[in-house]
């Protein structure tokens, strides 16, 4: 287990490394018609342009080592969390109505923590995690959720199974969870987004909660336009993060099916084709953001997408079918370029995520907690598999 000093040293090394290579990950992949590193790293761009297909992370690392003389990769020595010797396995009907991958996340999270009563389940939804914790760890659980209908459904299920779990209809962002934390010894949050998990950290510190287990998610879901660090170490860091950087930290899709991935590729091609069209027609060289669209629109073809996107931006283009085909083709060509840019950015994704996780761990360390950062499951179950556990020092 790393000490606070150990986490601080790791954070400083990581911060310096990310700052040194910021030009490689702090870019807008689809805003430029050219590779964004033509001036700074022409050999890397030449390699990307000539590479057949999308490079793997290992291939990107090899290219960075080859073309950037000062580059050295960061190495992480992740610990495998030791599982408790005995946990009571729930009956199969316990997971009824919960999708397989979600249930696997809940099981893995519960196996990886050691809470004591009373446990606050933060942003509980229907309280599936809380039910398993109450059952396996023999703890009383207080589940906080802002949607009343989910509270009602969760309470009905807990009563049916005679689980020691109660629900409160609570808006934690308005401070309504403070009293529950003051009465609790433990608090848990599985994939609470952005401001939700950072609010838990701050309010748990204030309430002197003895034990915390948090798997952070969606750091970009915050009111702030730029990232506001939690710890003193991150506040003094060289690396400053925008909303786009925060999105990159969690931009890893390992669960998309073939159909879902195909639709994403088609939508990206249509958006990039429309972008090329509007740049040409309006004689300007900047990306034009278009709102999200319904997936059904993609089945109607590129011409229908252009009509829809034009209406969204109050534009009108008169184009022949040949011209539309040309811009659609450009869109698909640009998809390959964007994917190559993103593969370089993705190489730094996990490091950005760890920077954010360390910020949270250091905030807890600075306020009297002993923290541990681990992975609670394989990334095939969920890419957001990092767990922060914290015990308040005596």
Indicate residue ranges for each PLM-predicted region.
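Class I S-adenosyl-L-methionine
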Residues: 1-36, 183-394
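Conserved Class I S-adenosyl-L-methionine-dependent methyltransferase catalytic core
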Residues: 32-112
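Conserved class I S-adenosyl-L-methionine
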Residues: 117-125
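Conserved SAM-binding loop of SAM-dependent methyltransferases across substrates and taxa
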Residues: 126-138
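Conserved SAM-binding motif I beta-strand of class I
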Residues: 140-145
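Conserved SAM-binding loop
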Residues: 154-155
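Conserved SAM-binding strand-loop segment of SAM-dependent methyltransferases
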Residues: 162-172
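Short amphipathic alpha-helix with an adjacent loop that forms part of the alpha/beta core around
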Residues: 175-183
